[in-house]
Amino acid sequence: MSTQLPDGLYLHLAEDDYFGQAGALGSTDLVKLYQQGEGWWWSSKLNPERVEPRREALNFGHALHSIVLEGVDAYEARFAVEPDRRDYPDACVTKEDICAALDERGVQYRKAARKDELAEVCRVEAPDVCVWDAVLSAFTDEVGGRETVTRDEDRQLRIMAEAVHSHPDIGPLFASAPGHVPLAEVSVLWTLPDGIRRRARLDTMLPVATGDLKSLGNWSGRPLPLEVGKIIADRGYDLQKADHHGARRVAYDFIRQGRVFGASEAELAWLRRFPAEAPRWGYFWMFYQKPDPVAGRAPILFPVWEDFGSETHRYGHRKAWAALETYRRCMATFGPDKPWTRVERLHEIREGAEDRVFLPHWIENPNPAPDEEEAIA
């Protein structure tokens, strides 16, 4: 179990520690509470029979966050590029390949030897023979705890990062200034007056804005302004944005109180300037599409800016408030251990009923049956 941390602003907080804060609600929880109500409990860690969702590889998204928000140096320190077979055209892949290479060099070996044993023979007796398994093993030893990306992904990431930083609107947001320190994955943990634990993780906190990178996912191909608008609405990103605005306000309080953890001296000095020098800020999403050479998808970056106090900020705040009210009501009714359910009032179809079900017009059949008067009399 992760260590339970005190309220405060955290930099460089491990993902497992952030998500491991027992009972702390994040913005994704609020979106589920608003959109699914009681269904939130069933997908939460409170449900002992919860089924972990299948997650596709997230390394590309993590790497994009790192190279765009923290810079190339941070990306290269955190990620390692996997060996690519194309860079080792003469590598021995199969046992038969290794045997053939040893035979060419007149090296003696046991015919019944395992593949790994033959690789060791190559290391000692024929070091000029490249064994693919040995390349991978050496890479594993070298990479340590770093995450990995493929050679193709590394190239794509660098192209996308360059596109962001050279963008006429978004690029200047990331431009270095005296004392500027990149702030990525800013974690905020706090407690509401009624004891509800909260958490938020800001992709990047810049003086002029809070930024969030989002995947376009399976883009339908419709015009991007329409597609992105639908994504924001469907995924509850307006709620998330409003919650991030609230979290940043809390973060400013923690900065003033000295409740900042995990920051370097340079990061701490930079953070201390925010409350006075950046009292108001905007918000931007950077939607991206991962390139796919096979499907013919280009890397796409689609930035969206919103001012503090916008209409969607207001809508999102209302939804976040409603989500917390749902949480309070259900916790009071069911508690954390009993499954959350909902039984609606008895409804009727008849017109004028207080609780009415509304049928679609196409349910009607205009053709009378010969015996219908007798049948329904």
Residue ranges of predicted features:
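Extracellular structured ligand-interaction cores
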Residues: N59-G61, R199-R201, V208-T210, R280-G282
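Secondary-structure boundary elements
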Residues: F174-A177, L206-D212, R249-Q257
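Hydrophobic/aromatic-lined pockets within catalytic cores
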Residues: V68-D73, L192, S215-N218, R249-D253
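Short helix/strand-bridging catalytic loops that position acidic/His residues to coordinate divalent metals
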Residues: L192-P193, W219-R235
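Short alpha-helix boundary/capping segments
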Residues: E52, E56, G229-L239
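Conserved catalytic cores of phosphodiester-cleaving nucleases, focusing on short active-site segments
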Residues: A200-E227, H244
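Metal-dependent nuclease catalytic regions and adjoining charged, substrate-binding loops involved
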Residues: A233-D238, D243-A377
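Metal-dependent nuclease catalytic cores that hydrolyze phosphodiester bonds in DNA/RNA
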Residues: M1-R199
